[in-house]
Amino acid sequence: MALRLFRKSSFFAKISMEGPKGSSPFAFYAFYQLYSHLNPGKSSSLSLEDIRRRLYPDFKIDYNEKTSLFITWKKKSNKHHTIDTNEENYILRGCIGTFAKMPIAHGIEKYSLIAALEDRRFSPIQKRELVDLKCSCNILGNFKTIFRGGGNPNGDIFDWELGKHGIELYFKHPKTGTTCSATFLPDVMPEQHWNKEDTFANLIEKAGYWGNISEVMDNFETYFIEVIRYEGKKSSITYEEFNKQLKDIEA
């Protein structure tokens, strides 16, 4: 069976993250959703277009296009760093998204809150934590199946670049035979200092199998069902940056 090359997203191709300090209207809008949820009535209602027009006037958004996205929340791990954008000083607080394509504004509105409040690995983010948060919005595109298992395995599970590609893995559970899946976004591997083998080992564990991972890797043609690579365009904003821009937009 031929490997799948997914239809390229024109929305993904058009995005250029040119906001200040790697920010964008997407990251601001995601942070704004949680801020408004935890502070009902405190801020005027702003649309993504309001934010783009007032804060990022040169940023182009096609609202008719649909895209895949993930929202990530991180929290300062060192309270002594009052203003700090270094990723190493933040710890994961929630990350959820979708590979399904949906309008960008709706996707951010939905998954900014799901990632903050419904990630089962963490308790819901509380209002008091807002000042320590950093929010990232990762727009995904250029999906490509690089390996497909089955009776006639095809492809190369290592046909991807660290720091450039995210990986989505589907594999057969060695004990139950059920299909398991997990993904890591492109920035995770460099942050964790993983090589490609480490990445697959951690994907297998993330999907819920804590048995003999070496057996799975040594026989990946038997266990791996599909490996998909993809790219992401990430923008981030800290609370300090968000709060300053919110004051600017409401002045």
UniProtKB/Swiss-Prot annotation:
Against NCBIfam families, the record matches this protein to: TIGR00296 family protein (TIGR00296)
Other comments on record: Present with 1710 molecules/cell in log phase SD medium.
**AMMECR1 domain location, by residue?**
21-246
* One Pfam family linked to the record: AMMECR1
Protein name, per record: Uncharacterized protein YOR289W
One annotated Gene Ontology cellular component of this protein: nucleus
